[in-house]
Amino acid sequence: MDVKRIKRWQAFRIRGERQRYINVYEEMVKLTDKLNKSVDAIVVEGRRDLITLRRMGISKEIITAHEIKHRDLRGKRIAVLTDFDSHGEKLNKEISKFIESAGGKVKQVYREMFCGIALKRGIRQIESMRKTLRESELMVFNSGCWK
């Protein structure tokens, strides 16, 4: 390959990567907005997950898994955002059963949406999404593509 073709290919690859970051960033912003409007509380596994969601812009009540038994859940719409590995799946089922038995309504659709975004970037933990969001913000705002 000649030098011009190599440079063109590299520029195309960089634009493609930048566009993927922009898409991930936009999806995360939209999902954060939906969560803030549609649920009363969010349950996560631990403190790092809580911090990650706060930094992503979640303003609703965030409850860690070990605190959930001490909360009044009656009539609340709750999203359960555990990790996307086998342990997280099992914990998600246990927490969801507990919430429903306590009179709450579990909104599973948000876990599925978060999982979709995370798996596109190879992420299996909620706390790792903070790094992806930061990378996406840098790519979006440094590229001049943000409107």
Model-derived regions: residue spans:
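TOPRIM fold recognition
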Residues: 2-13, 47-56, 61, 65-147
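Phosphate-handling DNA/RNA-contact segment within nucleic-acid enzymes
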Residues: 1-41, 47-52
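Short glycine-rich phosphate-binding loop at a beta-alpha junction
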Residues: 41-42, 79
